[in-house]
């Protein structure tokens, strides 16, 4: 056999192996990225449940003729912000903002005693607390998935493949204050 033919055959086999390995790493990166997006969607769906809580609080404020126009206006702005933003970097800060705003709105019973007798209002406080725990659990899973993705993406051949195909890092969610 001709030595040039053997060299070409070896190079061809090496290129095929590199291609197969590269495709494997690419597929794993796509799979991990999809898992991160799925976990973020779980966080986002829980955040959208807050829109229902915001609507209910707004109804209670207007029904009971409470003079809390500032809170009502802030609630409407928060609702719009949640519904308009769906990217990770825009949505994660809304969690802290909505937590603070809803805590403020749900503390109106310290000013208006009639709210303590309102069963809908009291159920709403429980619903909010459950929603907080659900979001925190979803965020914990999201952060774990982001860590796995970012770590995998930054190592060895996966790093090369991720740079070639421009896979970007995902942001972690950092809670400003605990529940």
Where are these regions (language model features)?
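A helix-centric hydrophobic-segment signal that preferentially recognizes long
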Residues: 2-179
């Amino acid at each position: 056999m001709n030595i040039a033919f053997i060299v070409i055959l070896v190079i061809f086999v090496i290129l095929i192996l590199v291609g197969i390995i590269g495709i494997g790493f690419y597929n794993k990166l796509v799979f991990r990225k999809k898992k991160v997006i799925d976990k973020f969607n779980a966080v986002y769906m829980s955040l959208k449940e807050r829109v229902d809580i915001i609507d209910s609080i707004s109804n209670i404020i207007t029904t009971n003729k409470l003079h809390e126009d500032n809170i009502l206006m802030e609630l409407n702005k928060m609702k719009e912000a949640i519904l308009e933003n769906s990217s990770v970097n825009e949505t994660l800060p809304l969690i802290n903002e909505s937590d603070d705003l809803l805590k403020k709105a749900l503390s109106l019973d310290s000013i208006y005693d009639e709210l303590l007798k309102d069963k809908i209002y009291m159920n709403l406080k429980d619903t909010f607390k459950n929603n907080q725990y659900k979001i925190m659990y979803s965020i914990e899973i999201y952060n774990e998935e982001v860590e796995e993705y970012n770590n995998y993406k930054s190592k060895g051949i996966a790093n090369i493949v991720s740079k070639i195909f421009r896979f970007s890092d995902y942001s972690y969610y950092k809670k400003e204050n605990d529940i």
